[in-house]
């Protein structure tokens, strides 16, 4: 459903941001 899509998008975004932060450390 739509909620699942939003949850997936949020997870992908969080993972992407976490990866960016880790690269800077």
Swiss-Prot record:
Tissue: Expressed by the skin glands.
Gene Ontology biological-process entries: innate immune response; symbiont-mediated hemolysis of host erythrocyte
Record InterPro entries: Antimicrobial15
Domain of life: Eukaryota
Pfam families linked to this entry: Antimicrobial15
One CC-aspect GO term: extracellular region
PTM sites of type Leucine amide: 25
Key words of the record: Amidation, Amphibian defense peptide, Immunity, Innate immunity, Secreted
Compartments (UniProt record): Secreted
UniProt similarity note: Belongs to the frog skin active peptide (FSAP) family. Ocellatin subfamily.
Role, per record: Shows a low activity in stimulating insulin release from rat BRIN-BD11 beta cells, and acts without loss of integrity of the plasma membrane. Does not show antibacterial (E.coli and S.aureus). Does not show hemolytic activity against human erythrocytes.
Protein name, entry field: Ocellatin-L2
Native source organism of the sequence: Leptodactylus laticeps
